[in-house]
């Protein structure tokens, strides 16, 4: 006999994030390391929300109470974040591989990445910076990311998304000779 699927978690579109007030939904998502927990709600980034909508875990309503499809949410989010497409592909790939992925904004990166084996870790091991194969990047820019990652005792992972949406990861750092 198949287990009864859990109910879809209701969420609301806020100005620059998705907000969940449903206590059961907050508990379920927080347990799986999604979102940022606040006193009486859980907030999701657009990338997290897109991932959860694609999996039918959340149902997002806009300010007029209209249910947003994946495509509609993507369109709204893309206005705010021009790198949304490639960030989403990397987020989805890492989550599907079993990693816990959090925003890396305060480190100047796209994501913080936690080891799969220890999701209760307080500190992430990696910072992930996302690039498109189609847009050139200066080596000085990458050097700056390596320097920041090193200064906060994290390893830098460069995620490059190609035209087909495939992701390749490179570990960047200092080499002591």
UniProtKB/Swiss-Prot annotation:
Sorted UniProt keywords: Lyase, tRNA processing
Reaction(s) the record says it catalyses: pretRNA = a 3'-half-tRNA molecule with a 5'-OH end + a 5'-half-tRNA molecule with a 2',3'-cyclic phosphate end + an intron with a 2',3'-cyclic phosphate and a 5'-hydroxyl terminus
Protease found in the keyword field: no
InterPro entries linked: tRNA_endonuc-like_dom_sf (IPR011856), tRNA_intron_Endo_cat-like_sf (IPR036167), tRNA_intron_Endonuc_cat-like (IPR006677), tRNA_intron_Endonuc_N (IPR006678), tRNA_intron_Endonuc_N_sf (IPR036740), tRNA_splic (IPR006676), tRNA_splic_arch_short (IPR016442)
Record Pfam families: tRNA_int_endo (PF01974), tRNA_int_endo_N (PF02778)
Entry EC no(s): 4.6.1.16
A GO term from the CC aspect: cytoplasm
Function: Endonuclease that removes tRNA introns. Cleaves pre-tRNA at the 5'- and 3'-splice sites to release the intron. The products are an intron and two tRNA half-molecules bearing 2',3' cyclic phosphate and 5'-OH termini. Recognizes a pseudosymmetric substrate in which 2 bulged loops of 3 bases are separated by a stem of 4 bp.
Protein name: tRNA-splicing endonuclease
Species the sequence originates in: Methanococcus vannielii (strain ATCC 35089 / DSM 1224 / JCM 13029 / OCM 148 / SB)
Taxonomic lineage: Archaea, Methanobacteriati, Methanobacteriota, Methanomada group, Methanococci
